Amino acid sequence: MVLKTKENKKFDIYLKSSDFAVSKKASKLIKKLNKKHPKRKSLNSFEAKKYDIYFKEVCKAVTNGINNQLICNHINLKILPGEFVVILGKSGSGKTSLLSLISALDRPTSGDSFVCGTNTICCSDAKLTALRNKNVGYIFQQYGLLRDLDVDDNIKLALPLKKRFNNNLEELLERLELKEHRHKKVHKLSGGQQQRVAIARALIKEPKILFGDEPTGAVNIDISKKILQFFVEYNRDKGTTIVIVTHNEKIVELAKRVIKIHDGKIIVDYLNQNPKTIEQINWV
């Protein structure tokens, strides 16, 4: 979908100019779409505080300097504390763009977008960073570990210096079967062990929400099942909100809530009344 804006009309003039002028104008349009909005009172701020994520009519637009395109299209979404949510979509469906918004990695172009009670559309970059550091944990398909540091030090990197001694560390090492590897350099670990280190790093600060972007995409089925089992148990035991973004329809069967996205729109959103266990799912 293309948004027709005043900027688009003005841009026609620049198409007859030099390439430099076009590039300069395009840069300004991109900055305008991604800048923070002035503080404004939202009619939904009181209701939003009940949710970890509260989105109402949220849009995200990108530009090539000539046309603006919606990559997230009027998203309405409410996620309560403690939910286990799977967002399902094919490549190019907009699921990663949505993840960037609901995890406060990016600001929307319009709408009300509350993450842990904060309206992210009004936040400066510094405030978005503070919001993420306090409330959000991430697990990506690429682990982002420092290969020459050991397991302990990689995990502790997620903590402020004054909190490097953390009681949560021992529990995570135990639950993720990493205790015997804690002093090994991570480049000496298997792929599955490295993934578990990344999970521990995301959870060491005890975030309110854990986001996983294709968290099992780079490991085999056996390791995937162990990782997913950990998510299920952690959600049950700690009450941490977990949101997994994936193209794998098998993972949907574990979720308490399933959201499907296509062309930047939520097309399905339902509660799974009978989520399956790892053993009940046919992984073949």
From Swiss-Prot:
One of its GO terms (molecular function) is ATP hydrolysis activity. CDD domains: ABC_MJ0796_LolCDE_FtsE. Residues 53-284 form the ABC transporter domain. Keywords: ATP-binding, Nucleotide-binding, Transport. ATP binds at G89, K90, S91, G92, S93, G94, K95, T96. PANTHER family: ABC TRANSPORTER ATP-BINDING PROTEIN MG467-RELATED, LIPOPROTEIN-RELEASING SYSTEM ATP-BINDING PROTEIN LOLD. Belongs to the ABC transporter superfamily. This is Putative ABC transporter ATP-binding protein MG468.1. It comes from Mycoplasma genitalium (strain ATCC 33530 / DSM 19775 / NCTC 10195 / G37).
